[in-house]
Amino acid sequence: MWKRYAAVLPANPWNWIAVWRRNYMAWKKAAIASILGNLAEPVTSLFGLGFGLGAMVGRVDGIPYVAFLAAGMVATSAMISATFETIHATFARMQAKRTWESALCTQLTLGDIVLGELAWAASKALLAGTAMMLVAATMGFASWPSVLFALPVIALTGFAFASLAMIVTALAPGYDYFIFYQTLFLTPMLFLSGAVFPVSQLPDIFQKLSHLLPLAHSIELIRPAMLDRPGGGVALHISALCIFAVMPFFLSVGLLQRRLLS
């Protein structure tokens, strides 16, 4: 059994680049529309909640509410971009377009393909998160140096959510099933991770639950950087995101092996 599983793992450290490049070549034809689409929801939330609700809320943790919200929207934009790329575009390449089927006829293994797809989703998340942060910095809700410090965190956040979404992609019979992942996992996590309001406002049980959510760890790294504040538990948050990035990858490869190669 181990030999069968090992045979579908990445063949070498660079094969995935071919998959990434193929996706990039297809994406760049509609790059502007893709970027605007990924920015629409977080930017709308930033302006709608930040200025509308912010006028009533005032300050949160000593800062204007819109500045507090901006960091949450940066992490959220990375989450949304990586997730939707994986559960929709990747699923289409695997199921409807049969792009994976063609790729498996080459020297690429299933692991190479999955790793390339995750790297591409993380790249789109990095682009979306960076664009959102530039909007926040332009409006004065983030320091410009923080953009550079937050880039690795945004990329890692994208990879982590892409890995989690790949499990859903491996299990879902069709597109209709993705709505369960969005409504039962992503939406509750948005409100439990400190993106919209401080986690300290939640009941104790939900505060403890937030420590298990990848979005919470991402926000705990991005918000202090954007606000030029010292952050605590940096190693813990990075380690948690790495676990969410790596473990689901291996699990999804095993699930996809059963689905495609059995």
From Swiss-Prot:
Q: Which family does it belong to?
A: Belongs to the ABC-2 integral membrane protein family. Lipooligosaccharide exporter (TC 3.A.1.102) subfamily.
Q: How does the record describe its quaternary structure?
A: The complex is composed of two ATP-binding proteins (NodI) and two transmembrane proteins (NodJ).
Tell me the GO BP annotations in alphabetical order: oligosaccharide transport
Task: Name where it's found.
Answer: Cell inner membrane
This chain belongs to which protein, by name? Nodulation protein J
Query: Which NCBIfam families does UniProt cross-reference here?
Result: nodJ
Which ranges does the record mark as transmembrane?
35-55, 62-82, 125-145, 147-167, 177-197, 236-256
